[in-house]
């Protein structure tokens, strides 16, 4: 386990643009320009990770694969790639970009046998995205229910999943603060590290997440708050890293 909270600024892409959605709803996006420039801006501000999402692939309406590869190639920092990774071909393409790890979401729910094999073959280059409403998982770009969170977590733990990215869908993009109780509950149910996503709005939210590092929260994804200027990445990193 890490002894500090890793911050992962998000770069979410749709139709070649950097966007942020409200509660993951297609059509709710606010646009923030060129995703390559956004990723470079976060790197220059001191980020050691970028959370890179292809929303078109997640919604099954196309892909931004070449653009994702361009972004990974332009960066010197580590990239966690997400969105539409559901079969051997899309997984191979994602890994071939040189990203450090991929997030698998829907496929972990709809194709458990494939997911088991991928976890066994790729180890900590694979994280499982658990997108949650209450106790229920959301799939297919958060448009379909995907079963019980804790039953799925137990199955994935037994298969050796190295890491979970846990998103409270109702919090995502809403600037209302993270769901700390959900994160505590997930950390209590698994020994694997957890990356928190959804709701980070203020530096106080980051401080609250830092308090969960000892129970298993390894990192936090920040998106809308950064793009809307609620705090700067430099200030957030100074907070999480302390004297590091």
Swiss-Prot record:
SUPFAM superfamilies: Ribulose-phoshate binding barrel. One of its GO terms (molecular function) is phosphoribosylanthranilate isomerase activity. GO terms for cellular component: cytoplasm. InterPro entries: Aldolase_TIM, His_biosynth, HisA/PriA_Actinobacteria, Isoase_HisA-like, Isoase_HisA-like_bact, RibuloseP-bd_barrel. Keywords: Amino-acid biosynthesis, Cytoplasm, Histidine biosynthesis, Isomerase. It catalyses: 1-(5-phospho-beta-D-ribosyl)-5-[(5-phospho-beta-D-ribosylamino)methylideneamino]imidazole-4-carboxamide = 5-[(5-phospho-1-deoxy-D-ribulos-1-ylimino)methylamino]-1-(5-phospho-beta-D-ribosyl)imidazole-4-carboxamide. Pathway: Amino-acid biosynthesis; L-histidine biosynthesis; L-histidine from 5-phospho-alpha-D-ribose 1-diphosphate: step 4/9. Its EC number is 5.3.1.16. It is found in: Cytoplasm. It comes from the Bacteria. The keyword ATP-binding does not apply. The active site is at 12 (proton acceptor), 131 (proton donor). One of its GO terms (biological process) is L-tryptophan biosynthetic process. Gene3D superfamilies: Aldolase class I (3.20.20.70). Pfam families: His_biosynth (PF00977). Belongs to the HisA/HisF family. This is 1-(5-phosphoribosyl)-5-[(5-phosphoribosylamino)methylideneamino] imidazole-4-carboxamide isomerase. It comes from Nocardioides sp. (strain ATCC BAA-499 / JS614).
